[in-house]
Amino acid sequence: MTASSGPGIALKGEAIGLAVIAELPLVIVNVQRGGPSTGLPTKTEQSDLFQALYGRNGEAPVPVIAAQTPGDCFYAAFEACEVAIKYRTPVFLLSDGYLANGSEPWSIPIFDDLPNIDPNFAVQNDDVAFMPYQRDKKTLARPWAIPGTSGLEHRIGGCLLYTSPSPRDS
């Protein structure tokens, strides 16, 4: 999870695009503020929707969720985490200065009553080869292989190379 406002999100555009192609579940909170460029940090505005939808190079779509009240911020963030993990994608959570600085009474949820978020980690099975490119038919997400787990490498016909080839070799 990371948070910023419009100018900071603009600087993170390439990394967000990389997270899309790498299928990394993460939540990006954008607390919107007014104006172009560095803008007006003390003026609130809801002007970053297009940035959230299209602010990356190429086709890198991401889900966008917006909180509607200060009390809704927790549930919107929880929903963003659910979507990010279930579908292996970055998710934008939009807020603004009014929500960031506002308050309202709300009941703190009982955490045992919240739905469980299952990351669907890949497990090594000696009987079946790990197929990282196979996807869940319902969500189209891949199992989440924990980096470094033996036998869960994403390798189809590749080979390990511990020395870089020299241009003279070609």
Protein language model regions, located:
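Short capping/connector residues at structural and topological boundaries
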Residues: E14, Y54-N57, S103-E104, F111
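Thiamine diphosphate
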Residues: M1-L53, P63-A84
